[in-house]
Amino acid sequence: MFGFIEGVFLVLTITEFILGNLVNGFIVSINSSYWFKSKKISLSNFIITSLALFRIFLLWIIFIDSLIIVFSYQTHDSGIMMQLIDVFWTFTNHFSIWLISCLSVFYCLKIASFSHPSFLWLKWRASRVVVGMLWGALLLSCVSTMSLMNEFKIYSALTRSKDTPNMTEYIRLKRQEYNLMHVLGNLWKIPSLIVSLVAYLLLLLSLGKHTQQMQQYSIDSRDQSAEAHKRAMRIISSFLLFFLFYFLSFMILSSSRFLPETRIARIIGVVISMSYLVGDSFILIVCNNKLKHTFVAMLPCECGHLKPGSKGPSAS
């Protein structure tokens, strides 16, 4: 039944889908154009471009999933179609999350300043460390996707047993096992979350100490460099906040099958996920000078907060 909640959900989904494709498509087109013209691309821009491209795929997958939730919810957890969506979603989403982690580590090693020997060793080898992380992320994404095979086998056994009489207890146990496997699939995301959290917190700690020192020794408390570091801290905090909200959406989607209002929980999880894919990509534009300058030039009126002269944490 198509009600008020489904109507609002559909409007939000379509709006976020269009905005997400525009924002991420802008990142891909601008960076690809510079790459084609100069025949080279920095590691950070390569990661950002790859991330935007994978987010476009994610937006399409989530949009298709949203249409199934609204118009054919009874078939949402069944059939080959949903298994294909699960496979593409798992790989694309897992690799996208690791791309965020790689970008976080890269910014941390490039911007943060600590005197610890281990940190300095990693800082001098930042590019090699991040490239190694990218290969590891690709491998882990493949492994996490292959782990779905066991979940599909359980679901297949569950489907076959429905047509067999006197199998109530077996069906109940298999359903519990299937739901548990689905929830445990989120454990693959924990390592990338920890890596990103550590990188973000180190960045905030380093920028906070640096800003404090500059305010202490600077005659003018509104020193341009201090203001730049404050802006960087706000941007990093925004990244962290969006990232935590994205993981919250996973928890909602995974636990939805254990809640009385399963459909509502899934709707909330989908809206949060798509909001993240739009909002976080916009922050990527704001904190990247090349993307920001092009974006501001395309605006019909000049925005004070996005003037080309204002610098983010990344100058690449």
Swiss-Prot record:
Membrane topology reported for the UniProt record: Multi-pass membrane protein
Top-rank taxon, per record: Eukaryota
Main location per the UniProt record: membrane
Residue positions with a glycan: N166
Location in or out of the cell: Membrane
PROSITE patterns: G_PROTEIN_RECEP_F1_2 (PS50262)
Keywords per UniProt: G-protein coupled receptor, Glycoprotein, Membrane, Receptor, Sensory transduction, Taste, Transducer, Transmembrane, Transmembrane helix
UniProt-listed InterPro entries: GPCR_Rhodpsn_7TM, TAS2R
Topology feature Cytoplasmic, residues: 29-50, 108-128, 208-234, 288-316
GO MF annotations, alphabetized: bitter taste receptor activity; G protein-coupled receptor activity; taste receptor activity
Protein name from the UniProt record: Taste receptor type 2 member 3
Organism field: Mus musculus
